[in-house]
Amino acid sequence: MLIERGLLSIMASKCSGTWSTYKTYTTANGCPFMKPEGPPADGRTLALNDHHLVESLAHFNREKIPERAVHAKGAAAYGEFEVTADISDICNIDMLLGVGKKTPCVTRFSTTGLERGSAEGMRDLKGMATKFYTKEGNWDWVCLNFPFFFIRDPLKFPSLMHAQRRDPRTNLLNPNMYWDWVTSNHESLHMVLLQFSDFGTMFNWRSLSGYMGHAYKWVMPNGSFKYVHIFLSSDRGPNFSQGEQAKDNSDLDPDHATRDLYEAIERGDYPTWTANVQVVDPAEAPDLGFNILDVTKHWNLGTYPKDLPKIPSRPFGKLTLNRIPDNFFAEVEQLAFSPSNMVPGVLPSEDPILQARMFAYPDAQRYRLGPNHHKIPVNQCPMTFNPTLRDGTGTFDANYGSLPGYVSESQGVNFARPQEHDPKFNAWLSQLSSRPWMQTNENDYKFPRDFYNALPEFRSQEFQDKMVENIIASVAQTRREIREKVYHTFHLVDPELSARVKRGVEKMDASFKQVSLSRL
């Protein structure tokens, strides 16, 4: 027993990064070994009985783990979250109760669609996920830099991602695939326009804002609740890469956003974000003019649509990142997030995309990191107690010792009270369920139309013009039948937008033909 405790103590010290007492080079089993260079000391030829060589090569072959199915490329930093305003009137979450309360956290920024080696400056959604190590468990805020998404039907997600990835025949990016999918799924048009604006090419991670997109429920002790949408706005303000600048950033330094983040933190220029919450009383939800559970629409902050109610935000906290991880693989590549990681006082809404993500994210981590991914130090909550989750690949702790693999009151286990809410607050859901809101509807054209027409006002005319130019450059690479579908689809949004895209594509075609003829 004493030997076992001693070994556990040594293992704990190693896991904590205390290596000062372990200076002798060894093989994997701890056997001291000579310097790992050159042929065997006795001059014999290399053979499989050279245990150190076999061990080194075999381990090298297994260094890589599956990359993330989405958000493959990323960077992370540690920091803290501080409550800056009293929101106890709408919130019963321990982490957010008490102005000045601080919680340690880690934030990972990422690209979305392409592989781990892709350039950070490419036109793409960007991820911003934060894990808060609270006293009541780990709470994950899994955000994108856009406040809405392409789809509201989770069955469409695999096809959406495949359409944005590489052609299975050539392994090249293929605009035909992307625009063919868009023109068959009109609920995506709101997101498409935002993606092709300069919002789609953010310059660095420090300027990125993160939006949960989904509605969650903040539940009070009496069972009442509010629908909420949380977002983190960069205190630096947005910083866009435009046109050739975005291409230059990707070509010259595909890791420029990560480099910028790490260099800023190392020189003490810590990036900060303001946490905001938008609140909707369930009784008011039917009167907003759109479905707050439809993640293809945003909660209007006053920019657009002008004819729909504004849903103001309340600032309540400050996120500061101030430390770079010591080891990328251990602390960034193995970092695992999920929208299902919540704490008391929070419940998911009925948003079908949110509910699908609550399964898909942990399942992706089980595939990528194993069934015990929650025990990896960067993911671990020190208060975790669940002896039903035991054994399996990656079990390197005491595995709950001799405790049985079930729980009951007779074991002296404490259980939290059920987190319930008053069903009368869900009355409007019965109205919602009677409407076929998964089908394409007028709001699927209204929101992108209002975004397009509002751009000159809340950004600039130049911002709108560049968005159209970016669309033209992409559509011009497609086949003629795809182009015709694009023109028709954009006509449903705004005839002027459709006409501008068509004129621009035809102009590019004419210029290309002229250049081709001049080379004859």
UniProtKB/Swiss-Prot annotation:
Which positions are catalytic residues?
H71
Gene Ontology annotations for the cellular component aspect, listed alphabetically? cytoplasm; mitochondrion; peroxisome
Q: Which UniProt keywords apply?
A: Alkaloid metabolism, Heme, Hydrogen peroxide, Iron, Metal-binding, Oxidoreductase, Peroxidase
Signal peptide region: none
Expression induction per the record is:
The expression of the ergot alkaloid synthesis cluster which leads to the synthesis of fumigaclavines is positively regulated by the brlA and stuA transcription factors.
Explain what the UniProt record notes about the effect of disrupting the gene for this protein. Accumulates the intermediate 4-dimethylallyl-L-abrine.
Report any one BP term from Gene Ontology: hydrogen peroxide catabolic process
Applications (biotechnology): Ergot alkaloids are known for their toxic effects on humans who consume contaminated grains or livestock that graze on grasses harboring ergot alkaloid-producing fungi. Due to their strong affinity for monoamine neurotransmitter receptors they may also have clinical uses such as treatment of migraines, Parkinson's disease and cerebrovascular insufficiency.
Instruction: Report the superkingdom from the record.
Output: Eukaryota
What's one Pfam family here? Catalase
Cite the GO molecular-function annotations of the record: catalase activity; heme binding; metal ion binding
The keyword Iron belongs to this UniProt entry's keyword annotation: yes
The cofactor(s) it depends on are: heme
Q: In which pathway does it act?
A: Alkaloid biosynthesis; ergot alkaloid biosynthesis
The record ties this protein, via SUPFAM superfamilies, to: Heme-dependent catalase-like
* Amino-acid positions noted as binding heme in the UniProt annotation, renumbered to this chain: Y361
Its family remark reads: Belongs to the catalase family.
Which PANTHER family does the UniProt entry name for this protein? CATALASE (PTHR11465:SF9)
Name assigned to this protein: Catalase easC
Q: According to the entry, what is the taxonomic lineage of the organism?
A: Eukaryota, Fungi, Dikarya, Ascomycota, Pezizomycotina
- The gene that this protein is the product of is easC
